[in-house]
Amino acid sequence: MKPKKRKKNKYIIRRVAAAFIGTGLIAGAAFAVSKIPAPSVPPLEIDGAAYSQIVTEVSAPVTVSLAPKEAAQQVMAYADPSKEIKITIPDSFPIETSLRSGYVIVYDVTSDRVLFAKNAESKAFPASTTKILTAAVLIDSVPPDTVFTVGTELSLVPEGSSLAGLSKGNQLSLPQMIDALMLPSGNDAAYTAAVTAGRIIAEDETLSDKEAAAVFAGRMNERLAAIGARDSHFTVPDGFHDENHYTTAADMAKMAVHASGYPLITEAAVKEYETVTFLSGETANWENSNKLIWDTSDCYYYYANGLKTGMTDEAGYCVVATARRFDHDLVCVILGGPASDIRWNETLWLLDSGFAYIREH
């Protein structure tokens, strides 16, 4: 698959507008800003100079001067897979704003500080952000040379699922399976992973597909307890809606930090697209559903290095975003977004505001 042509400036314009909204120079946006401690969002540099006005339309390409991209591709390295992750929600936050998404947290992993939270410990549905934990548990549950053969477990995949395009008889390696979970958010991959791993965990190849998937779900809940995500309970590997499959924004932040300890996950999370050849010889083209890392996307965020999106009618629009700047790692979780563009706009604004605060403190 060839890279897409770069779109002109839509993200740049919106991000500049977000910066000015953050400073209070412009009123009115998809979300209302009540206060941001000075200084606010750092100015963009365009052709070497700070951008000083809002442009509604630009016809010529705009060059943005930023730090070396390699710095943005560094990933978090704070997670110990066997250690509880503690996130304390304070009474007040450095970032104050009113957002339309229902459940939000911005967590500075490096300084162990919550910069913003909204209903962060309230019950929410994770949708496909579930696959962050699916991938971590999978890696720990199977030998690294496991061959995943797609089979009858495809019958468990709910109608209307996001898919990696797997067919019965396809054979994938463990790295390919992680990519199938993290890039196209394949529910087919999630069930092949869960059923294969469930039988390995139980040491019982005779388990039915449903029984094996249930074993894997049990292991996921054990992991949730181990990392301190005690307000979460998972029943399925793909995150398709189930009333008993739930989480909180704070718990999803813990899962993001936990996942940072797995190179297979962090390496997959920064891939924009991939053409993969299965062990069985078939090929597939996968695009990452996380548009923060697409440099051709309106939602592109230069410093992003992950992590996972999700959406169901019940969960709303969700994203667990990770980014690195100023030697700090941020996790921004949005669950219950009312629309896709609101999810992305609020994520971009929160990341910029978080790094602006970090820069000055």
Regions found by a protein language model. Give the residues of each.
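Short, low-complexity, disordered segments immediately C-terminal to signal peptides
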Residues: P43-A49
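Catalytic-site microenvironment of enzymes
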Residues: R15-V16, D108, A127, K308
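Active-site-adjacent loops and short helices of periplasmic peptidoglycan-processing enzymes
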Residues: P39-P42, I54-A250, A259-S260
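Hydrophobic single-pass membrane-insertion segments
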Residues: A29-P43, F355
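N-terminal Lys/Arg-rich, disordered targeting/topogenic segments
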Residues: M1-R15, F20
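Domain-terminus/edge residues, biased toward the C-terminal soluble/receptor-binding domains
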Residues: A229-R230, H241-D251, A256-H361
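Hydrophobic membrane-insertion alpha-helices, especially the h-region
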Residues: A17-F31
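Eukaryotic PEST-like, Ser/Thr/Pro-rich intrinsically disordered regions enriched for SP/TP/PP repeats
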Residues: K8-N9, G22, P37, Y51-S59
